Amino acid sequence: MIDSLDLVIDTVLAREVLDSRGNPTVEAEVLLEGGAIGRAIVPSGASTGAYEAHELRDAGDRYFGKGVLKVVENIEERIAPTICGLSASDQATIDGVMSELDGTENKSKLGANAILAVSIATARSAANGYGMPLYRYLGGPMASLLPVPLMNVINGGAHAANNLDFQEFMLVPHGANTFREALRMGAEVFHTLKQLLSEKGLSTAVGDEGGFAPNLQSNQAAGDLLVKSIEKAGFIPGEQISLALDVASTEFFKDGAYFFGGRNYSTEGMIEELVKLVNAYPIVSIEDGLAEDDWEGWGLLTKELGEKVQLVGDDLFVTNTSRLQRGINQKVANSILIKVNQIGSLTETLQAIDLANRSGYTSVISHRSGETEDTTIADLSVATRAGQIKTGSLSRSERVAKYNQLLRIEDELGSEATYAGSNDLGPLCGKK
């Protein structure tokens, strides 16, 4: 039996650490009266939506302005005195107290990175206090669904120094029976792709998220390479492994037009290009197919493709319930990308997932391009039964760490574990 006093927050500490790009980020530690401790490190994005919560940086010369000593100070001198003495098991109260202390809509006073680090560290400390894994603490007895990984094996856009306009070209091994099998399938295609790139004399250097970053003639060339890699690895495209795209179109949207492939496209022209891709390749998911403020265009895109593929809002929704509700009301998209640092607290993240579930939208739990060894999103994907996770390619330890955590969870669950697979993507698989 847990003594409630053991769950009371005693100490909150913070430190400046580095992310996978060598940039500073913040780690928080929450120590409870009973001795349990929770740690969390927050990630950082490269292609960030205009409506994301504010990531606080120091400015100045140190780390070229990217230091987070101000964030550390805010945690230890402002947040800590406010939440010490509260129970770590009362997540919503603690997150609410921090948001109130900040007092801004986008958490710009204390920094979303400060609030999120403490929020997740609090949840981890409570889980450890109860002696249970994080996915079980957050998700309860129903937390047993392992997600389909959307594996970013070709990087472009803001994630790589190459000539590809689209940001991510992903493998979706929905035809597997277990997560372990899905991971193997993805890894085998990844290595086959590397071999094909080498044979063509193309670069096998990797981008921020561990995928290859070759200079290819077009986005279609990337699709062709992935289909060939799937087949050469011994799998059936569209049946065992499909494709997903993160277009990240806000990055090349300017003055009302989309510029990629050397020419400008209207919204209607952009939609036409996406339709061509869906008809030509086994694509089951498209993220940010249009820009974050092109609401009218998103409505047209959803009418055109919403019954055929998963249309994911990332920059469009930024894990924000207000923007998601607008999308629901306007029948825009059918899925939300969940990035904990876009909204800045665990409670608000869970609220966004809940709203999506209640509204018939899917949720895709996601990493950021600037990641760390923190594996919270792996547990979160199982806790919420989201059914899908984006955590990069099959290389770079900060990406693989999440996959390995999911393997541990699957082993721990044993016969209770189920793999989302084609069932979770549902009619989106093979609905062409």
Swiss-Prot record:
It holds the Pfam family Enolase_N. GO terms for molecular function: magnesium ion binding; phosphopyruvate hydratase activity. GO terms for cellular component: cell surface; extracellular region; phosphopyruvate hydratase complex. This is Enolase. Binds a second Mg(2+) ion via substrate during catalysis. Its EC number is 4.2.1.11. It is found in: Cytoplasm; Secreted; Cell surface. Its main location: cytoplasm. The lineage of its organism: Bacteria, Bacillati, Cyanobacteriota, Cyanophyceae, Synechococcales. It is an enzyme of class 4 (lyase). It comes from Prochlorococcus marinus (strain MIT 9211). It catalyses: (2R)-2-phosphoglycerate = phosphoenolpyruvate + H2O. InterPro entries: Enolase, Enolase-like_C_sf, Enolase-like_N, Enolase_C, Enolase_CS, Enolase_N.
